């Protein structure tokens, strides 16, 4: 009996100590938070935090929240603190003033599966590995010289697309689908050395890319990560990566054994960099595959979506279309196709693309960054480990920066003061600083040449007598924000 009483006393003592410690820790946590000057936060719910306030179009929902809480907000997505920047001033503080502190990326169980433990360039955490890999990619794959070297690929695939559009005369053509095929063909050829026709690769690519659109519970509520297993998300991601890995392994092995000839592609360049002993940076095939995944994931959607929105705006604004056609026609001087060398002279073309990117940035919420240390940001205390999203869609429509911000007016860029390099914080569709997209120049080369040739060769209209002002511009959120419905047009040869 004495032993039982002793055990009960011990248990009561432990329980009392635990409860006391719990309340002490809660008090310390509360006191610590009250001493910090945190950014304004919308009311959150237990477990899910502010997820219920994001809706199907988070960039628009966050704009509405910022109108109430201000240009810098602290949300909680599950257990993840997420800072949201909604104007150019806050964006500049994050991506310039405190760029080093916000140069890392958050970790994610699903991204670890899709990108070999985030060994790619887009999602790798900041550090020596990321710096070395970025240097290799920028100097070997995406330099101006290399971008120019793929001119023949761009011309060939755009010429093929123009032929398909021409054959559609008398019926409507699905411009959106054509542009996805164009982007796939260009990027496959540049990355892998050849175009892989057939439904198998197309299906594999689209299944892989679709994984980035799916919500991973474990990424935001770690103790509920079993939900990803139960829902099949983890299994699906593992399966599609295994299929893609097997496909890429064959291609890489063929390159390594010189079975594929016909010029240097991205895999050749990465294999050469892997064998280069002078860099002092050793990496395995998983890195090569992760980089190729990046190129597919970041390139196909952003290129096709960018062109799709430009063509939509041109069809909706025939006066802009005519002005652009005039410029392209005068500079091309009767040639059968627009030459890439002439693109630099087409300043209105560049203005049209910039204006479309202002209204329709491919990624309206830049890939989240993560703070590596405590930061004092515009008077607020930001703790290490806080994730950061920049709403570039909202910045592009800020009425304090842009006159009539919802109107499509390319003339606002006619002076050429804003370039693709991302140094203007009122216009940053591809980010700025250490984490700016390194492939902007590569993508722009495809986008400019494709648009110039489409408007040079064809007059476009909406089918079935639909008026241009009635074109549906609804959007759908995904890897990129693309058209909700495909762009269907009729194309008439101009000459």
Curated annotation (Swiss-Prot):
<dbReference type="InterPro" id="IPR036396">
    <property type="entry name" value="Cyt_P450_sf"/>
</dbReference>
<dbReference type="GO" id="GO:0004497">
    <property type="term" value="F:monooxygenase activity"/>
</dbReference>
<dbReference type="GO" id="GO:0005506">
    <property type="term" value="F:iron ion binding"/>
</dbReference>
<keyword id="KW-0812">Transmembrane</keyword>
<keyword id="KW-0503">Monooxygenase</keyword>
<keyword id="KW-0479">Metal-binding</keyword>
<keyword id="KW-0472">Membrane</keyword>
<keyword id="KW-0560">Oxidoreductase</keyword>
<protein>
    <recommendedName>
        <fullName>Cytochrome P450 Tp4149</fullName>
    </recommendedName>
</protein>
<dbReference type="InterPro" id="IPR002401">
    <property type="entry name" value="Cyt_P450_E_grp-I"/>
</dbReference>
<dbReference type="GO" id="GO:0020037">
    <property type="term" value="F:heme binding"/>
</dbReference>
<keyword id="KW-0325">Glycoprotein</keyword>
<dbReference type="GO" id="GO:0016705">
    <property type="term" value="F:oxidoreductase activity, acting on paired donors, with incorporation or reduction of molecular oxygen"/>
</dbReference>
<keyword id="KW-1133">Transmembrane helix</keyword>
<dbReference type="Pfam" id="PF00067">
    <property type="entry name" value="p450"/>
</dbReference>
<keyword id="KW-0349">Heme</keyword>
<feature type="glycosylation site" description="N-linked (GlcNAc...) asparagine">
    <location>
        <position position="419"/>
    </location>
</feature>
<dbReference type="InterPro" id="IPR001128">
    <property type="entry name" value="Cyt_P450"/>
</dbReference>
<dbReference type="GO" id="GO:0016020">
    <property type="term" value="C:membrane"/>
</dbReference>
<dbReference type="GO" id="GO:0051762">
    <property type="term" value="P:sesquiterpene biosynthetic process"/>
</dbReference>
<dbReference type="InterPro" id="IPR017972">
    <property type="entry name" value="Cyt_P450_CS"/>
</dbReference>
<comment type="pathway">
    <text>Secondary metabolite biosynthesis; terpenoid biosynthesis.</text>
</comment>
<keyword id="KW-0408">Iron</keyword>
<dbReference type="GO" id="GO:0016114">
    <property type="term" value="P:terpenoid biosynthetic process"/>
</dbReference>
<feature type="transmembrane region" description="Helical">
    <location>
        <begin position="208"/>
        <end position="228"/>
    </location>
</feature>
<comment type="similarity">
    <text>Belongs to the cytochrome P450 family.</text>
</comment>
<feature type="binding site" description="axial binding residue">
    <location>
        <position position="437"/>
    </location>
    <ligand>
        <name>heme</name>
    </ligand>
</feature>
<feature type="transmembrane region" description="Helical">
    <location>
        <begin position="4"/>
        <end position="24"/>
    </location>
</feature>
<comment type="function">
    <text>Probably involved in the biosynthesis of germacrene-derived sesquiterpene lactones.</text>
</comment>
């Amino acid at each position: 009996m004495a032993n039982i009483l002793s055990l009960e006393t011990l248990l009561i003592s432990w329980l009392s100590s635990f409860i006391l410690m719990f309340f002490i820790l809660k008090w310390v946590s509360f006191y610590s938070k009250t001493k910090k000057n945190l950014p304004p936060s919308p009311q959150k719910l237990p477990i899910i935090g502010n997820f219920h306030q994001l809706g199907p179009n988070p960039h628009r929902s966050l704009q509405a929240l910022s109108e109430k809480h201000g240009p810098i907000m602290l949300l909680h997505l599950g257990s993840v603190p997420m800072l949201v920047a909604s104007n150019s001033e806050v964006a500049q503080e994050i991506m310039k003033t405190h760029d080093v502190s916000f140069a890392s990326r958050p970790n994610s169980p699903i991204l670890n599966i899709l990108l070999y433990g985030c060994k790619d360039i887009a999602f790798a955490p900041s550090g020596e590995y990321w710096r070395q890999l970025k240097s290799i990619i920028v100097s070997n794959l995406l330099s101006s010289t290399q971008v120019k070297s793929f001119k023949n690929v761009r011309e060939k695939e755009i010429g093929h697309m123009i032929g398909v559009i021409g054959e559609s005369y008398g019926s409507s053509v699905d411009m959106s689908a054509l542009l996805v095929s164009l982007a796939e063909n260009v990027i496959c050829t540049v990355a892998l050395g050849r175009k892989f026709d057939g439904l198998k690769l197309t299906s594999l690519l689209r299944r892989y890319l679709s994984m980035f659109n799916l919500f991973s519970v474990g990424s935001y509520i770690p103790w509920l990560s079993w939900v990803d297993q139960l829902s099949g998300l983890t299994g699906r991601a593992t399966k599609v990566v295994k299929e893609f890995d097997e496909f890429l392994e064959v291609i890489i092995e063929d390159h390594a054994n010189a079975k594929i000839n016909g010029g240097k592609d991205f895999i050749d360049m990465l294999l050469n960099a892997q064998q280069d002993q002078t860099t002092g940076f050793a990496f395995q095939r998983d890195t090569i595959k992760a980089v190729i995944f990046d190129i597919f994931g970041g390139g196909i959607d952003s290129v096709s979506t960018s062109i799709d929105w430009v063509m939509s705006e041109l069809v909706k604004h025939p006066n802009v279309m005519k002005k652009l056609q005039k410029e392209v026609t005068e500079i091309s001087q009767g040639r059968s196709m627009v030459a890439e060398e002439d693109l630099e002279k087409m300043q209105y073309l560049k203005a049209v693309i910039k204006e479309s990117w202002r209204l329709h940035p491919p990624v309206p919420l830049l890939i989240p960054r993560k703070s590596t240390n405590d930061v004092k940001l515009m008077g607020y205390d930001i703790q290490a480990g806080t994730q950061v999203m920049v709403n570039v869609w909202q910045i592009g429509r800020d009425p304090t920066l842009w006159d009539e911000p919802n109107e499509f007016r390319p003339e606002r860029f006619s002076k050429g003061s804003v370039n693709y390099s991302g140094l203007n914080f009122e216009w940053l569709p591809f980010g700025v600083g250490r984490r700016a997209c390194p492939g902007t120049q590569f993508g722009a080369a495809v986008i400019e040449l494709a648009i110039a040739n489409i408007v040079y060769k064809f007059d476009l209209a909406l089918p079935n007598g639909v008026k241009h002002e009635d074109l549906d511009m609804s959007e759908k959120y995904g890897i990129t924000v693309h058209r909700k419905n495909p762009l269907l047009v009729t194309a008439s040869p101009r000459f």
